[in-house]
């Protein structure tokens, strides 16, 4: 894998999506992640990708993704600390289902200027049909607990909604 990264010709990379793991604690109906490798991205691979994206010296976005990226929080922290040490002009983003957010994680993300997007596909009755826990029950309660952690810590977040035939007719706005 390292040799593949080294052989990529570097152009100005505007956005680097780091899929920190294929693992997820949910089993969403439409998700492709269940078909992917469930291994964790190593910190070495993550840092090599960041160096490649930073090579142009221009501002770029690093988005932590997955599966559920907070399942590999150690790699996320390593990247965040490395970006700070190197003073890379990176904008940091996390796309999460929110269920693993704790006060400690939320404060770390806030202090390190990691923007947070939480996935929610509509009102609970609709979201629970699309976003489910591994036991088959709806995940809305877990997602809302994560959003509450952010609210309690005065941390703003964005919401990401996957529009499907199940929710398109009931979304407002």
Located regions from the model:
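Short, charge-rich binding segments
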Residues: 6-10, 30, 85, 107-108
